[in-house]
Curated annotation (Swiss-Prot):
Residues 1-28 are annotated as: Disordered. Belongs to the protein kinase superfamily. AGC Ser/Thr protein kinase family. This is Serine/threonine-protein kinase Sgk2. The keyword Repeat does not apply. It comes from the Eukaryota. It comes from Rattus norvegicus. Its EC number is 2.7.11.1. It is found in: Cytoplasm; Nucleus. Two specific sites, one in the kinase domain (Thr-193) and the other in the C-terminal regulatory region (Ser-356), need to be phosphorylated for its full activation. The modification Phosphoserine is found at residues 10, 334, 356. Residues 15-28 have a biased composition (Polar residues).
Length: 367
């Protein structure tokens, strides 16, 4: 299992009173009591993800519920707001999770997201250990399409790993968790925050050098390597030794791989970000690599390609692809309670001004 993301110091809020105000945003008037919260399906540093059924129409959603106090204690509010911003910019790309609502109570933040129940790629890798090349190629292509789309919006993802790659009920990829995304990075610009998950950190991040969007292509290479070989490329249980391996150890590719797969891994996992595949033409470099020659990218984008694996879920209540560690946990009653006072002018609530969001009614009805 991958380590938790490396902690990142948050930028200081822009307002003198400590609030983060993103300006006016629509208020959906949503309440926790609008939903029946059925099962815990995931957990993170600051809260949980729950399967929820909307009472008004019976629609199922994945609701990410975050504790404001935990976020503020760790000075992570800017990253939570950045995650919301990235979700808002996703105009329904087929391989990115969609945000339907976001709202808040005085104690909690709520992201109402598309419900995806085919399981994490991590879950399937744990069970099957490794994938054959055609299956790994399919997932890598769909993830690359999603990353390329984020880059086109000047967003660097920065935390690509099997735990953040979900499968939908048909077996297509859905990329989720945008908490470490960096916005507003132009193609020639760099950033320098030390963040990510240890197994997938690029050398330039470890060296604390300025880095650009090529950092995501390193992570894609690490995930592809893990799909084909069962472990990340420079894995060691000793994190310090693993960092040393990432920085200095030559890439070792076990036998049995095609020439195209080996060439792609060597290109994506090049230690010099300036020479890495994707450093010149970004997603086009990946798209045009010979490893993906069997892929019709237009058919891929429009989901006209049959996924190599079907999760065979029997409807929204089928949770067999979720870790029982989560699904067997009791749902806290406080998650579904709507406090008498839904707003506050100070404290935790004021740090998340501008958080609430609702899609247009037409979008909600069409979903």
């Amino acid at each position: 299992m991958a380590s938790s993301p490396v902690g990142v110091p948050s930028p200081q809020p822009s307002r003198a009173n400590g609030n983060i105000n993103l300006g006016p945003s629509a208020n959906p008037n949503a309440r926790p009591t609008d939903f029946d919260f059925l099962k815990v399906i995931g957990k993170g540093n600051y809260g949980k993800v729950l399967l929820a059924k909307r009472k008004s129409d019976g629609a199922f959603y994945a609701v990410k519920v975050l504790q404001k106090k935990s976020i503020l204690k760790n000075k992570e509010q800017s990253h939570i707001m950045a995650e919301r911003n990235v979700l808002l910019k996703n105009v329904r790309h087929p391989f990115l999770v969609g945000l339907r609502y976001s709202f808040q109570t005085p104690e909690k933040l709520y992201f109402v997201l598309d419900y995806v129940n085919g399981g994490e790629l991590f879950f399937h890798l744990q069970r099957e250990h490794r994938f054959l090349e055609p299956r790994a190629r399919f997932y890598t292509a769909e993830v690359a399409s999603a990353i390329g789309y984020l880059h086109s919006l000047n967003i660097i993802y920065r935390d690509l790993k099997p735990e953040n790659i979900l499968l939908d009920c048909q077996g297509h990829v859905v990329l989720t968790d945008f908490g470490l995304c960096k916005e507003c990075v132009e193609p020639e610009e760099t950033t320098s925050t030390f963040c990510g998950t240890p197994e997938y950190l690029a050398p330039e991040v470890l060296r604390k050098e300025p880095y650009d969007r090529a950092v995501d292509w390193w992570c894609l290479g690490a995930v592809l390597y893990e799909m084909l070989h069962g472990l990340p490329p420079f894995f060691n249980t000793d994190v310090a030794q693993m960092y040393e391996n990432i920085l200095h150890q030559p890439l070792q590719i076990p036998g049995g791989r095609t020439v195209a797969a080996c060439d792609l891994l060597q290109g994506l996992l090049h230690k010099d970000q300036r020479q890495r595949l994707g450093s010149k033409e970004d997603f086009l470099d990946i798209k045009n690599h010979m490893f993906f020659s069997p892929i019709n990218w237009d058919d891929l984008y429009h989901k006209r390609l049959t996924p190599p694996f079907n999760p065979n879920v029997e409807g929204p209540a089928d949770l067999k692809h979720f870790d029982p560690e989560f699904t067997q946990e009791a749902v806290s009653k406080s998650i579904g309670c709507t406090p008498d006072t839904m707003s506050s002018s100070s404290g935790a609530s004021s740090a998340f001004l501008g958080f609430s969001y609702a899609q247009d009614d037409d979008d909600i009805l069409d979903s």
